[in-house]
């Protein structure tokens, strides 16, 4: 009886800790893109965020996958695409300006990733929406 209560408490506590880390990761991602991080450091990496939450990159990546069903890299990539969509629809910036603002070294990399994920080039997406 005691062992089961202890086990359940450990499991429940771990689940909550993992959810808290996901929330922190989401906040850190937003803070990164809202700051000059992309201009200073380029595209964010899994290691960068793992360091911020004091976990190894491998453990952090495994935890993100278990909680979200996506790898940490996919999660970051989806946030990049979401931010690119917002900029395409909410500003008059060129695709190049958006790419550099998100931390891409070359605008073509954003265009390629955007097309792979959405099925549209950034310009096609902008004109259709």
Task: Set out the residue ranges of the language-model regions.
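…primarily DNA-binding HTH/wHTH and HhH modules…
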Residues: 112-129
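Residues within helix-turn-helix
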Residues: 47, 58, 94-97, 107-108
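A short, Lys/Arg-enriched amphipathic alpha-helix from helix-turn-helix/homeodomain DNA-binding modules
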Residues: 15-53, 74-93
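Terminal helix-turn-helix DNA-binding modules in bacterial transcription factors
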Residues: 67-105, 127-129
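Residues within the helices of the helix-turn-helix
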Residues: 47, 73, 96, 112, ...
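Compact structured core domains
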Residues: 1-15
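Short hydrophobic/aromatic patch on the recognition helix
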Residues: 60, 109-110, 114
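Core residues of bacterial helix-turn-helix
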Residues: 53, 64, 102-103, 114
